[in-house]
């Protein structure tokens, strides 16, 4: 069902007309049918919300998820409200049965997982005891060789049982916590990181124009975070940025490009003025003056350059390299969270099932910080303001606080940065790259059970060729030589920006003593 309903927005704007769409058990809303291509402004799951009819206003109905979401709606007439109530109630009833079955299966799997975890702890204790016994036998010498053989056999048997139980834990976890639970995009909404594949061409454009169109981050009226951007425009924008790093093959025609903080581009020729900032036309005239060893036409950087192949990192909706720090190195909250969302799909390319726990942890922490942000967007414009607010309120160390969520979020981002750095530096073994990154970042914060789960996940890591192929926008691009150069170029932009912002957060947490040695 679809149609126009009035939604209460705030005390300033009051009731505003919105176009609602009920499909697949999800009620989503848009500014208008014509703006549906931009993606929904908000949505609510009918299976988990309460439908309340207003006691006085016979055109009003409220959809509520206690403590999370509140949709206050009004129809244009009593009859229209009745039609919506029937449709919403039917959708909720149809979903309840299947939801109950899924919850039952989820509970059973959770209980089985707890049982297996208890067995793991038991086997761990046995391993410790048997290792101590082995040490004693080894220290005593080889007087009784049979006893040494028996101890070794018993230790091997316990190790095999431990590994088998750990694998069963992973199988149960994979069955119960699939990656499909992480994102539920409302019908009609564009996917976050899906771009149309098209052959890249070099556009002839005025280079003095701004190369970056601001990405509009629309925080939904009900608190969800979404990114709105036109796919073709965004791909074109990223292509322009990438093209600035091409070099002309003509002799003595080296033209370098770099982005200013305001998004404009400065082109440097051989005869640049000392201030280094002139427009393209003046440089072309300088390069063409008599006395130069060679003459380049303005079009030469485009005509003679090699093919530019877009990668996952050059076509991200929002990137850490796009973020401009505010006053006192303030990290803008909305842009940072959107950049975090944009990098999460890297885990899907490593393995959507085995890395689901890591992905769920990252997404969960992003949502916790966002929930704090939307409570007061005017005040919490930077991450530092959120942390300092909780420090002053003495809730920074409270479990599930935004400060704690940001702590684990930056740890997860450090792991991803470490892994991508290994790949950029030429590591061809994905398992080795992951293991090195894990050892430098997350391992010290994990107990033996989580370390074992990660070790098991490493065994399912893809090959280098498969991982690189997953980072392409157009199938088969990874086989081209220009793709490797493109990856190096994009990561050289992306990783330093990411590292700079993580370093700022590290300093903030160190100053206020917010780092934790807690092991999970």
From Swiss-Prot:
Domain (PH): residue spans on this chain: 1-93
Region feature (Glycolipid transfer protein homology domain): 311-520
Residues the record lists as Phosphothreonine modifications: 139, 153
Disordered: region residues: 255-303
Gene Ontology terms, MF aspect: ceramide 1-phosphate binding; ceramide 1-phosphate transfer activity; ceramide binding; glycolipid binding; glycolipid transfer activity; identical protein binding; phosphatidylinositol-4-phosphate binding
Cellular localization per UniProt: Golgi apparatus, trans-Golgi network membrane; Membrane
PROSITE patterns listed in its UniProt record: PH_DOMAIN
Keyword annotations from UniProtKB, A to Z: Golgi apparatus, Lipid transport, Lipid-binding, Membrane, Phosphoprotein, Protein transport, Transport
InterPro entries: GLTP_sf (IPR036497), Glycolipid_transfer_prot_dom (IPR014830), PH-like_dom_sf (IPR011993), PH_domain (IPR001849)
Membrane topology of the entry: Peripheral membrane protein
Primary location: Golgi
Cysteine-cysteine disulfides: none
SMART domains: PH
One GO CC term, this protein: nucleoplasm
Function: Cargo transport protein that is required for apical transport from the trans-Golgi network (TGN). Transports AQP2 from the trans-Golgi network (TGN) to sites of AQP2 phosphorylation. Mediates the non-vesicular transport of glucosylceramide (GlcCer) from the trans-Golgi network (TGN) to the plasma membrane and plays a pivotal role in the synthesis of complex glycosphingolipids. Binding of both phosphatidylinositol 4-phosphate (PIP) and ARF1 are essential for the GlcCer transfer ability.
Name of the molecule in the record: Pleckstrin homology domain-containing family A member 8
Organism of provenance: Rattus norvegicus
Lineage start: Eukaryota, Metazoa, Chordata, Craniata, Vertebrata
Encoding gene per record: Plekha8
């Amino acid at each position: 069902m679809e149609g126009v309903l009035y939604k209460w927005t705030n005390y300033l704007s009051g009731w505003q007309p919105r176009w609602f769409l009920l499909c697949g058990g999800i009620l989503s809303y848009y500014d208008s049918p014509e703006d549906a291509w931009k993606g929904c402004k908000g949505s609510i799951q009918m299976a988990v919300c309460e439908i309340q009819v207003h006691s006085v206003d016979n055109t009003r109905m409220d959809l509520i998820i206690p403590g999370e979401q509140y949709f206050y709606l009004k129809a244009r007439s009593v009859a229209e409200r009745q039609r919506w109530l029937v449709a919403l109630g039917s959708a909720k009833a149809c979903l309840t049965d299947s939801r109950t079955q899924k919850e039952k299966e989820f509970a059973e799997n959770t209980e089985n997982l707890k049982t297996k975890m208890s067995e793991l702890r038991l086997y761990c204790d046995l391993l410790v005891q048997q290792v101590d016994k082995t040490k004693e036998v080894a220290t005593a010498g080889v007087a009784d060789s049979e006893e040494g053989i028996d101890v070794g056999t018993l230790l091997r048997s316990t190790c095999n049982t431990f590994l088998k139980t750990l694998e069963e834990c992973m199988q149960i976890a994979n069955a119960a916590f699939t990656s499909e639970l992480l994102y539920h995009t409302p019908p009609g909404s564009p996917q976050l990181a899906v771009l149309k594949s098209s052959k890249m061409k070099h556009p002839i454009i005025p280079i003095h124009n701004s190369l970056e169109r601001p990405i509009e981050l629309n925080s939904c009226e009900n608190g969800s975070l979404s990114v709105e951007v036109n796919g073709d425009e965004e791909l074109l924008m990223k292509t322009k940025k990438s093209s600035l790093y091409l070099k002309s093959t003509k002799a003595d025609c080296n033209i370098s490009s770099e982005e200013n903080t305001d998004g404009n581009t400065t082109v440097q020729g051989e005869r640049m003025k000392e201030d280094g900032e002139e427009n393209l036309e003046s440089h072309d005239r300088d390069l063409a003056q008599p006395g130069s060893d060679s003459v380049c036409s303005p079009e030469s950087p485009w005509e003679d350059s090699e093919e530019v192949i877009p990668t996952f990192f050059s076509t991200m909706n929002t990137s850490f390299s796009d973020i401009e720090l505010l006053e006192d190195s303030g990290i803008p909250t909305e842009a940072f969270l959107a950049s975090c969302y944009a990098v999460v799909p890297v885990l899907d390319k490593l393995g959507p099932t085995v890395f689901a726990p890591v992905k769920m942890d990252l997404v969960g922490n992003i949502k916790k910080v966002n929930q704090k942000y939307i409570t007061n967007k005017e005040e919490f414009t930077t991450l530092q303001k959120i942390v300092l607010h909780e420090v002053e309120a003495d809730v920074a160390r409270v479990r599930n606080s935004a400060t704690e969520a940001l702590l684990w979020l930056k740890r997860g981002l450090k792991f991803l940065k470490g892994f991508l750095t290994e790949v950029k530096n030429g590591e061809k073994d994905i398992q080795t790259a992951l293991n090195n990154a894990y050892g430098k970042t997350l391992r010290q914060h994990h107990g033996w059970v989580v370390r074992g789960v990660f070790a098991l996940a490493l065994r399912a890591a893809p090959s280098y060729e498969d991982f690189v192929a997953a980072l392409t926008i157009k199938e088969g691009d990874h086989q081209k030589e220009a793709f490797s150069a493109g990856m190096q170029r994009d990561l050289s932009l992306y990783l330093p920006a990411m590292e700079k912002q993580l370093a700022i957060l590290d300093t903030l947490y160190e100053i206020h003593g917010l780092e934790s040695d807690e092991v999970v």
